[in-house]
Amino acid sequence: MARNDETPIRVGLLGAGTVGSQTARLIVEQKDELSARIGRPIELTGVACRHPKATEAFPWIDKAIVTTDTMSVATNSDIVIELIGGTTAAREFVLAAIESGASVVTANKALLAKYGPEIYAAAEAKGVDIYFEAAVGGAIPFLRPLRESLVGDRVTSMLGIVNGTTNYILDE
């Protein structure tokens, strides 16, 4: 089924802990701005977590979209944001999301270190994207400029400290 510019982009969130709940807040609070930037409506359509009752502390999360059925959220979204951590279950959900045609955003270093090549190959085969800038370099935005702004340049090396903790210590 072809999508038009008015069909909302369905965002599924896997994990509603500290990072997940704040990610949900940003999506909900900045929905209009995000939609304008993207050129299509965006909608948080599922939040998967182990303890749905815990989301009561986060009034911005619509309780009607909270579930313990992580696989359902992973396979019924256009974009899946994986914030559950670990590797085994995260791998299963990320690969299922990719197989269902969703692009994936993750901050999971362990997942990418252990299963990165498999995940990238699956994404390439399905024609979807994997975004992981938050997983590297303390979320310093250097992957996107390399991929988009410097695409015509031959970058032979990069020097710097790309670890958020180390940057914080050095700044202090």
Protein language model regions, located:
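Rossmann-fold NAD(P)-binding glycine/threonine-rich loop
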Residues: 89-100, 109-148
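Short glycine-rich anion-binding loops that position phosphate/pyrophosphate groups of nucleotides
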Residues: 85-87, 110, 163
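N-terminal glycine-/serine-/threonine-rich beta1-alpha1-beta2 phosphate-ribose binding loop
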Residues: 2-100
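Short acidic, glycine/serine/threonine-rich loops at helix termini
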Residues: 24-25, 57-60, 116-119, 141-148, ...
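Conserved anion/nucleotide-ligand pocket segment
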Residues: 148-172
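Active-site catalytic pocket residues across diverse enzymes, especially alpha/beta-hydrolases
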Residues: 27, 31, 123, 150
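Glycine-rich beta-alpha junction loops
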Residues: 48-53, 136-138, 161-167
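A short hydrophobic/small-residue beta-strand
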Residues: 104-105
